[in-house]
C-alpha cells in the first residue's frame, strides 16, 4: 500500500480488470458443461470426486441431514441467522414491485404486469468454508419476489457433507431442494438439468473463476445475476475519522482475497500517513495475514486530494463495490455520490454490518460496474410484461398514423395488418 497525492483531473482506477480466465480455463469449463449436458448425474458425480474429493452417492440433501445440521449448530448461531433473516426480509419487502394499469380518455388501457420467475438456482461456495450469509442474500429476494421453486447448490467437503450453517439457513427459509455439488458442474446441472435435477430459470451466487466462467457460458440458456470480481472497499474520510477504524475496515476486505482492493480517499495527509502505518501494524495480527498482505501490497492505495470535492470525484470514478463515508457530516455528501454498490454512512456503519446483518443485499457490482449495475434485489427475480388494450375509438383515430409508420420502416405487412381492421370496420 502506498500514498498517492492527486489533484485536478487525475485519472484513477481499481488497478485490475475483470478476470476473464485463461483460454485453458475457458476450455475446461466448456468441456465440463458439455459433459454434464451429455451424461447428467454421472458427470456431476465424477467431477465431484475429481475436484472436491468427495464420493457423494446422492446429490440431494436428505431431511435427516437437515436435522443433523440443526443439532450441530449452536443455538446462539441459529438465533443470529434468524435475526439476520428478519432484517434482510424487512428491507427487501420494500423493493417488491406490483402490476399497474391506467386508462386514457379514449378507452385505451395500458399497463405493466409483474410476474415472478418460476424457478431460481442459488450457488453457495463451500468445501473448506461456509457462507450462510450467501444463502440469505440470494434466497430472500427470490422468496419475496414470489419464486415458487428455489434450488440451492453447494460443493461438499471431503466428508460428503455441507456445512451446518448453510443447511440451517436454507431450511429456515423453506428451501429443501438442496444439492451437494459445486463448481462449473453445478452451474451446468442447474442450467441444463440432469436425470434428477430440473433446470432453473436464473442462477445467482458467488464462486471461483470456474463458477464465474460457467455462469458466463450458460447465460442465455438461463439468466444470471452478474459476473462478480474480487471484493472492493473504498473509504472516503476527512481529518475527523479514526485511523484505527479505517485500517480495520480496509483489512476486512483485504482478508477476502489476494486480489481484493482496499482504497482510502482523503483530503488529510496526516490521516493518510496514520492509516498506512496502522494497516501494516494490524495486519501482523490477522489469522489470514498472508492473503491480506498480498491484497494490501498489490491492490491497496491511499489517495490524498486537495479538497473533499476532489475526493468525491475520485470515488465516483472508482465506482466501488462498498463505500464508507467517514466524515464530520456523512449525510451531507450522500447526494454527491453517483456510483457505488453500497454506501455506509458514519463510523457505526462498518462494512461487515452490511455483509451480514443490516438488511441490504451484499451481492454487489464490482470492478467499477457500479457505474451501470445495481445490487441483487427483488426485481431481479421478477419479469415485466407490457399490457395493451386498444379501444375501437383509439384504433380508428390512430390507424392511419400506425400504418404510415410501418411503411416508413419498409414493413408493408405491418401496415396491411392495421388496414385490414379498418376495412372490416367500414
UniProtKB/Swiss-Prot annotation:
Task: Report the function annotation for this chain.
Answer: Catalyzes the sequential NAD-dependent oxidations of L-histidinol to L-histidinaldehyde and then to L-histidine.
Identify its protein family: Belongs to the histidinol dehydrogenase family.
Recorded hits in HAMAP family, A to Z, give: HisD
Superkingdom of the source species: Bacteria
Q: Which PROSITE patterns has this protein been placed in? A: HISOL_DEHYDROGENASE
Pfam families, per the entry: Histidinol_dh
Query: To which pathway does this protein belong?
Result: Amino-acid biosynthesis; L-histidine biosynthesis; L-histidine from 5-phospho-alpha-D-ribose 1-diphosphate: step 9/9
Q: Which UniProt keywords apply?
A: Amino-acid biosynthesis, Histidine biosynthesis, Metal-binding, NAD, Oxidoreductase, Zinc
Give the residues the record marks as binding NAD(+): 123, 185, 208
Which positions does UniProt annotate for Zn(2+) binding? 253, 256, 355, 414
Listed binding positions for substrate are 231, 253, 256, 322, 355, 409, 414
What is the protein name stated in its UniProt record? Histidinol dehydrogenase
Protein species of origin: Bacillus licheniformis (strain ATCC 14580 / DSM 13 / JCM 2505 / CCUG 7422 / NBRC 12200 / NCIMB 9375 / NCTC 10341 / NRRL NRS-1264 / Gibson 46)
| Principal EC category | oxidoreductase
A GO term (biological process) for this protein? L-histidine biosynthetic process
Q: How is the cofactor bound?
A: Binds 1 zinc ion per subunit.
Query: What EC number(s) are associated with this protein in UniProt?
Result: 1.1.1.23
Which GO CC terms are listed, alphabetically?
cytosol
Q: Which reaction does it catalyse?
A: L-histidinol + 2 NAD(+) + H2O = L-histidine + 2 NADH + 3 H(+)
Amino acid at each position: 500500500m502506498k500514498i498517492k497525492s492527486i489533484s485536478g483531473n487525475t485519472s484513477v482506477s481499481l488497478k485490475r480488470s475483470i478476470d476473464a480466465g485463461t483460454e485453458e480455463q475457458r476450455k475446461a469449463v466448456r468441456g465440463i458443461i458439455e459433459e454434464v449436458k451429455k451424461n447428467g448425474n454421472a458427470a456431476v458425480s465424477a467431477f465431484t470426486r475429481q475436484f472436491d474429493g468427495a464420493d457423494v452417492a446422492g446429490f440431494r440433501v436428505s431431511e435427516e441431514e437437515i436435522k443433523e445440521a440443526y443439532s450441530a449448530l449452536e443455538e446462539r448461531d441459529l438465533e443470529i441467522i434468524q435475526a439476520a433473516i428478519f432484517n434482510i426480509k424487512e428491507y427487501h419487502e420494500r423493493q417488491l414491485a406490483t402490476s399497474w394499469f391506467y386508462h386514457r380518455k379514449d378507452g385505451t388501457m395500458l399497463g405493466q404486469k409483474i410476474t415472478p420467475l418460476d424457478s431460481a438456482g442459488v450457488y453457495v461456495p463451500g468445501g473448506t468454508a461456509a457462507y450462510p450469509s450467501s444463502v440469505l442474500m440470494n434466497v430472500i429476494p427470490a422468496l419475496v419476489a414470489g419464486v415458487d421453486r428455489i434450488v440451492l447448490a453447494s460443493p461438499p467437503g471431503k466428508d460428503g457433507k455441507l456445512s451446518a450453517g448453510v443447511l440451517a439457513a436454507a431450511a429456515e427459509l423453506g428451501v429443501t431442494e438442496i444439492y451437494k455439488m459445486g463448481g462449473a458442474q453445478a452451474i451446468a446441472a442447474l442450467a441444463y438439468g440432469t436425470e434428477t435435477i430440473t433446470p432453473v430459470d436464473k442462477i445467482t451466487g458467488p464462486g471461483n473463476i470456474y463458477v464465474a466462467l460457467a455462469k458466463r457460458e450458460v447465460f442465455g440458456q438461463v439468466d444470471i445475476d452478474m459476473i462478480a470480481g474480487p471484493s472492493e472497499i473504498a473509504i472516503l474520510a476527512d481529518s475527523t475519522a479514526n485511523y484505527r477504524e479505517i485500517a480495520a475496515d480496509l483489512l476486512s476486505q483485504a482478508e477476502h482475497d489476494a486480489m481484493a482492493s482496499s482504497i482510502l480517499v482523503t483530503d488529510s495527509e496526516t490521516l493518510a500517513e496514520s492509516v498506512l502505518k496502522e494497516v501494516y501494524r494490524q495486519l501482523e495480527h490477522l489469522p489470514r495475514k498472508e492473503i491480506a498482505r498480498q491484497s494490501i501490497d498489490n491492490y491497496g492505495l491511499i489517495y490524498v486530494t486537495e479538497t473533499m470535492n476532489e475526493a468525491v470525484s475520485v470515488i465516483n470514478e472508482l465506482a466501488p463495490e462498498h463505500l464508507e463515508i467517514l466524515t464530520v457530516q456523512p449525510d451531507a455528501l450522500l447526494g454527491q455520490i453517483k456510483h457505488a454498490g453500497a454506501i455506509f454512512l458514519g463510523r457505526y456503519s462498518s462494512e461487515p454490518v452490511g455483509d451480514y446483518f443490516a438488511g441490504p443485499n451484499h451481492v454487489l457490482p464490482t470492478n467499477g460496474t457500479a457505474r451501470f449495475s445495481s445490487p441483487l434485489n427483488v426485481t431481479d427475480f421478477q419479469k415485466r410484461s407490457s399490457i395493451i388494450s386498444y379501444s375501437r375509438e383509439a384504433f380508428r383515430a390512430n390507424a392511419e398514423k400506425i400504418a404510415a409508420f410501418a411503411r416508413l420502416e419498409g414493413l408493408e405487412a405491418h401496415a396491411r395488418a392495421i388496414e385490414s381492421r379498418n376495412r372490416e370496420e367500414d
